[in-house]
């Protein structure tokens, strides 16, 4: 059943989406980046045109973004339109924000549900990978124990090849988190270029990592887009070429016991 709040917001945005009413729309959480928000009746996503298109946005991903940007008015609207209160609570920075969004009594998202995203969600589409990226990199409410579980799962599923090892280790040493590198790696491996572009926009310093990972998989699109002539990158690229010459093409592995052995021997 559609809530009264949802019906009211829909009626307001349909009748008052005019320039002279922007103050009202902002106050009600119906404006974002100078554009009026609509809920798509076809895919249930969010758009700016009140018509379905490939530009419709995932509500949960949009919710994470607006909370990070501290726009609680829009966050309340998205929650009334069906966005996940579990995600909202994960991104609230304090109890005041939880109370403002009325999510202080929402149960914590289970660790298993979050960890499942590492192995399943990124195979679907760009938006699902971006949700995983936001959860692992921008949420402030992960426990230390959960972060260690995430770290172990990432190490467990990363490609077990010397070239990937070398590339990850180079940028991990630069204080980039393993989860950030992992999400970017997945975007390249599954050719989710929209997600890749948005992640690199947040971490522009990782363009060399993107280029090298694209080079490992012979992805011409990635190599052309993120081409780099940095000396350190050239050196790392030469090592990859040497490794390719010795071991040939690369393949994915998910041998947890094998990767656990690496993780216990200063692999990272």
Swiss-Prot record:
Membrane topology label: Single-pass membrane protein
Cell compartment(s), UniProt: Host membrane
Induction description: Expressed in the early phase of the viral replicative cycle.
Similarity field: Belongs to the asfivirus MGF 300 family.
UniProt entry tagged with the keyword Transmembrane: yes
Protein name (record): Protein MGF 300-1L
Source organism superkingdom: Viruses
Transmembrane portions of the chain: 176-193
Segments on the Extracellular face: 194-268
Source organism of the structure: African swine fever virus (isolate Warthog/Namibia/Wart80/1980)
Keywords: Early protein, Host membrane, Membrane, Transmembrane, Transmembrane helix
Main location (coarse class): host cell
Cytoplasmic side: 1-175
GO CC aspect terms: host cell membrane; membrane
